[in-house]
Design a protein with these regions (language model features):
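Conserved AdoMet/S-adenosylmethionine-binding subsite of the radical SAM
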Residues: 1-121
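A structural preference for short, hydrophobic beta-strand core positions in alpha/beta folds
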Residues: 92, 126-129
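Short alpha-helical segments used as structural interaction elements across diverse proteins
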Residues: 112, 125-127, 140
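Radical SAM enzyme core and accessory elements
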Residues: 132-160
Length: 160
């Protein structure tokens, strides 16, 4: 991914770069984003800094907040240290439940603590408001559901 970020910076385009971070350290990011085992957080941040240096465009970091996984006070402090001094927006998205996945949405108290730590450290952060989660149409919930069906032959389709 860092080589692609460097290529994007060289294009002199008007693209806004959004990086899916989801964890403030390699140990946790290796679990959540398997490609991190090949490209660590440090290398990713170096590429992001290069993009900013070349383009002058503010970076966006995406962080899906998962209850009991990446929403601790320690995670917030580590994230603050990682982003401190960068011209960037941190877009935090509290997890929206998806059937079949083990993750949970953090409590309102956990979200508030996480936000307070980041804001106290001077991090520019936006917490996405949950919309559509009651009808499974929120961020992360829109995905194809498979159904058992018998494929139609061309003749059967023509007869229908």
């Amino acid at each position: 991914m860092p080589p692609a970020i460097r290529k994007l910076a060289a294009l002199d385009s008007r693209f806004h770069l959004a990086i899916s971070l989801h964890a403030p350290n390699d140990q946790l990011r290796n679990q959540l984003v398997p490609v991190n085992k090949k490209v660590g957080v440090g290398e990713l941040m170096e590429a992001a800094d290069h993009y900013f240096d070349v383009s002058g465009r503010k970076l966006t970091f995406e962080y899906v907040l998962l209850s009991g996984i990446n929403d601790s006070d320690e995670n917030a402090h580590q994230l603050s240290s990682l982003l401190k001094g960068r011209i960037a927006l941190l877009n935090v998205i509290p997890y929206n439940p998806v059937a079949g996945l083990p993750y949970k949405t953090p409590s309102p108290g956990s979200i508030a603590r996480f936000r307070k730590i980041l804001e106290s450290a001077g991090i520019v952060v936006k917490f996405r408001q949950r919309k559509g989660d009651q009808i499974n149409a929120a961020c992360g919930q829109l995905r194809r559901k498979t159904i058992q069906a018998v494929p139609l032959s061309a003749q059967n389709a023509a007869d229908s």
